[in-house]
Amino acid sequence: MQCFSFIKTIMILFNLLIFLCGAALLAVGIWVSIDGASFLKIFGPLSSSAMQFVNVGYFLIAAGAVVFALGFLGCYGAQTESKCALMTFFFILLLIFIAEVAAAVVALVYTTMAEHFLTLLVVPAIKKDYGSQKDFTQVWNTTMTELKCCGFTNYTDFEDSPYVRENNAFPPFCCNNVTNTVNETCTKEKADNQKVEGCFQQLLYDIRTNAVTVGGVAAGIGGLELAAMIVSMYLYCNLQ
């Protein structure tokens, strides 16, 4: 009985933390969606390069909602000793775990397919908004500065973009691989000669370089999810 009470308390405290994290993610996601400019101004230089490729606001809202609901279910199920809530918590966490494993396998096996899919989404956005949408342009400038890359695939992503039409030149990042002369006009010939790597390939390189760290974090998250599933099932099986 004492063991049951101890595990129940741990379950409540753990899920309370998850609940608060979900609420924080939701709050930040809503803030980014409503006032993205101020978010980028404060956190842009410090933000993860990987997050630059997605709409951060919607991503955080979706992730926050799932984490928030999961934390609430875990707390409620453990506190009220509700078998229904605990079983729902278990199955949602199991689905998330399976989805994460599947996503990891797909990412490892179908990297080329993922690149093609993302290219179809990202490149048209660059051609449409780079140079005309301030926040979008700032995000890409930060990404290209941090990763020392050019565009999603290469400099051709910027052809016909508002920036190229207005300046009759490509972003300086596309000509900054060798000479480091940012102030020089980046013509198509210079960009073609210097062949600065696209940001997707550069990001993959950085991830592979830090594979141990990435793998450790992923394993840690997976371990916590497995532990939470085991605890929830233990509580479920020991309830009257």
Swiss-Prot record:
Family assignment from sequence similarity: Belongs to the tetraspanin (TM4SF) family.
Keyword Membrane: yes
Chain's role: Structural component of specialized membrane microdomains known as tetraspanin-enriched microdomains (TERMs), which act as platforms for receptor clustering and signaling. Participates thereby in diverse biological functions such as cell signal transduction, adhesion, migration and protein trafficking. Regulates neuronal differentiation in response to NGF by facilitating NGF-mediated activation of NTRK1/TRKA receptor tyrosine kinase and subsequent downstream signaling pathways. Plays a role in the inhibition of TNFalpha-induced apoptosis.
Membrane-spanning ranges: 10-30, 53-73, 89-109, 211-231
Originating species: Macaca fascicularis
One CC-aspect GO term: vesicle
Sites carrying sugar chains: N154
Subunit details: Interacts with SLC19A2. Interacts with NTRK1/TRKA.
InterPro entries, sorted: Tetraspanin/Peripherin, Tetraspanin_animals, Tetraspanin_CS, Tetraspanin_EC2_sf
Lineage: Eukaryota, Metazoa, Chordata, Craniata, Vertebrata
Gene3D superfamilies attached to this UniProt entry: Tetraspanin
Protein location: Lysosome membrane
Residues in the Cytoplasmic compartment per record: 1-9, 74-88, 232-240
Membrane topology, from the record: Multi-pass membrane protein
Keywords: Glycoprotein, Lysosome, Membrane, Transmembrane, Transmembrane helix
Listed GO biological process terms: protein stabilization
Protein name as catalogued: Tetraspanin-1
Highest taxon in the source lineage: Eukaryota
Extracellular side of membrane: 31-52, 110-210
